[in-house]
Amino acid sequence: MQTLIHRGMAALHQDDFAGLYTLWSGTSALDHLQEADLALLMQRCDARIQAAPGDAGPWWVKCLIYLDRSAHFNSNREQALRTVADWAGRAIGLAPDKAEAHRLLGSAHYWLDEHAAAIGAYRNAQALQPQVDLQVRLFEMESLPAGQSPQLLQLDFRDGNACHYYGAGVSIGKWKRAGLDPADAGYVDAVQFALYEHCTTLFRQGLELGDAATCNTDTHTFAMCCNNLGILYMDRGLYAQARAILEEGLRHSQFQFLYQNLREAYRHQGMRAEAADLALTLMMDYELDTPLFLDCAQAACSHLNRVGRHADVLEIAEAAQEAFEALPDDAQADPELLRMYALVQAHHRLTAARALGRLQPQQVDTALSRAAAEANPHDLDTLFVHASALGEAREYPAAVDAYTTLIAQAAQQQDAQALKRARHGRGYLLLYYLPDAKAALQDFLAVQRDGTDDFYTYYYQANCHYVLKDYRSALPACDAARALLDDAMLQADPGSAAQLYMMEANCHMNLGAYPASLAAFERSLALHERADVRESYELARQLAAKPKKRLFGLFS
């Protein structure tokens, strides 16, 4: 944008008002000028009119200033637009064969809702120079009110001004509405897509030329076009293309909606880290409404917990609490807001606090998780948050009941991953806290039958058999879990791997297979040196070293 402004100022220095108009028309350049600069620019226009009364350029620039920033000069918008119409008429008198003044006259009447006058002026401008955004406006004023189908719109793409294609795309997008004929809606969507794509092509060409470009190269408008095109790509399920065009836009200008849509594209492509980074950017750099803030907060917290930034999660949770508690009571009861807030406070915050050793059962807000679950009885994530919160609060029977509700709902919705998570959660509580290892085993066997098993499925199966002293059944489960151990798993959770090997070793020892027991103990101790495991290992060594007693001592 600064480059575009500097190029415009260079044209002004040369008294090239027509060149300045060409550079800044259709851009947001004037929006970036201070009020003092606007006043100075208007003075320069007036001085040029006095010095060169036959030059239409300064009249074009005056019209452009009033169309975009009239509030600085006249608080009455209607009067300002009448002034634009007067100035445009003078410019037409000086250069009737130039499309610019006819366009400006048409725009003054368009914003005054004087469509008949606007149509006449726009038609004159279009006859002198094809302008794709005017073609859309003409169809909008003439054909749509007459009930004609949008499919009758035929555009002339000889216009070389990239900003016109962006403006046309925005205008035609307003034609989309509920109840629009599907064929008409499809046509409008296709035309809008073509307009934005051509806009980006022209912008790229202009940016490659740099200072040699004769058209405007407003990078902010380019970024806005990339944003809108990205939305259309996502509407088509083309998330890789959406990501690429949104990232391209972000290289030229940064604004909230561009970040939001790029974050959405990242989420659809499973790029959690990148989406979380943008969520943090949005929360830090922009004033977000509470729903968006909570959505960003829950996504960011999920990723930050995953990468070990637990203290940051607690900070975000505190900010989310302030935002939520500032809402009126009726807003706090909104199911969607409750869902997101509970995810932050009753799940991510607890995960972070537990990782930092700060979690106290009495700190768990089960009332919040219960309210969220009651408001969202079919949302599987919310039901899981409530069940896990009850577990953290050590309300184990209630937590098992909540997991049972979740299992039924997940089965009804045929969500295999939610079903696995719920069965793991309930089985874990039954195994370690109630305890009921036999019932817990049924949950882990069910996960295996569903085909969603992983290391922990077999690890918990082995633990259930071990607790039930069914060592022969525990060993195949240990083998299955060990087969799923890889370097990443060992690095992420060496404690569980060590515990698995310890169970395997004890099973072998209880069955009298001392050499196998020794090997398993050594694997366990290599991951985690524990005094009790070391003691068992030494015992296994002693037992392995003793000669086996034969029947009746005949071969001893």
Q: Which sequence ranges carry the predicted segments?
A:
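"A position-specific structural signal for the A-helix of alpha-solenoid helical repeats
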Residues: 6, 61, 104, 137, ...
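Residue-level recognition of tetratricopeptide repeat
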Residues: 9, 64, 71, 107, ...
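TPR-repeat structural position
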Residues: 17, 35-38, 81, 115, ...
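Single-residue signature of alpha-solenoid repeat helices
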Residues: 20, 41, 84, 118, ...
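Short coil/turn linking the two alpha-helices of tandem helical-hairpin repeats
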Residues: 28-32, 63, 68-75, 111-113, ...
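Hydrophobic/aromatic packing residues within the alpha-helices of TPR/SEL1-like helical repeat arrays
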Residues: 45, 81, 88, 122, ...
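Short coil turns that delineate tetratricopeptide repeat
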Residues: 53, 96, 130, 157-160, ...
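Start-of-helix register in tetratricopeptide repeats
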Residues: 57, 100, 133-135, 161-163, ...
